[in-house]
Amino acid sequence: MAEITSAKAMARTVRVSPRKTRLVLDLIRGKKVADAIAILKFTPNKAARVIEKTLNSAIANAENNFGLEKANLVVSETFANEGPTMKRFRPRAKGSASPINKRTTHVTVVVAEK
């Protein structure tokens, strides 16, 4: 049987737009886990907080479930898919209204041994 060398964590229905989340994910993809955490700590973005929590969860999954060493882990795969959109309306002049889409994101972080 093949040995497991990767672990995954997901954050679902996060109240940040997928487009903004992808910008932060591009910063950490392919980096060592320690470097990725340092980058996220100093990124002034709402998405960075969520991604940092998800990354820490993936690291914990790797250590506890699969017995992998944190020092050997690399962020191998990250992606942000679109979650459900909350549709709202903003009242405008003359009794009309404009639609507002409050987008949500499903964030996935995969860490693997290098």
UniProtKB/Swiss-Prot annotation:
It comes from the Bacteria. GO terms for cellular component: cytosolic large ribosomal subunit. PROSITE patterns: RIBOSOMAL_L22. Gene3D superfamilies: Ribosomal protein L22/L17. The keyword Acetylation does not apply. The keyword RNA-binding applies. Keywords: Ribonucleoprotein, Ribosomal protein, RNA-binding, rRNA-binding. InterPro entries: Ribosomal_uL22, Ribosomal_uL22_bac/chlpt-type, Ribosomal_uL22_bac/org-type, Ribosomal_uL22_CS, Ribosomal_uL22_sf. GO terms for biological process: translation. CDD domains: Ribosomal_L22 (cd00336). Belongs to the universal ribosomal protein uL22 family. Part of the 50S ribosomal subunit. This protein binds specifically to 23S rRNA; its binding is stimulated by other ribosomal proteins, e.g. L4, L17, and L20. It is important during the early stages of 50S assembly. It makes multiple contacts with different domains of the 23S rRNA in the assembled 50S subunit and ribosome. The globular domain of the protein is located near the polypeptide exit tunnel on the outside of the subunit, while an extended beta-hairpin is found that lines the wall of the exit tunnel in the center of the 70S ribosome. This is Large ribosomal subunit protein uL22. The gene is rplV.
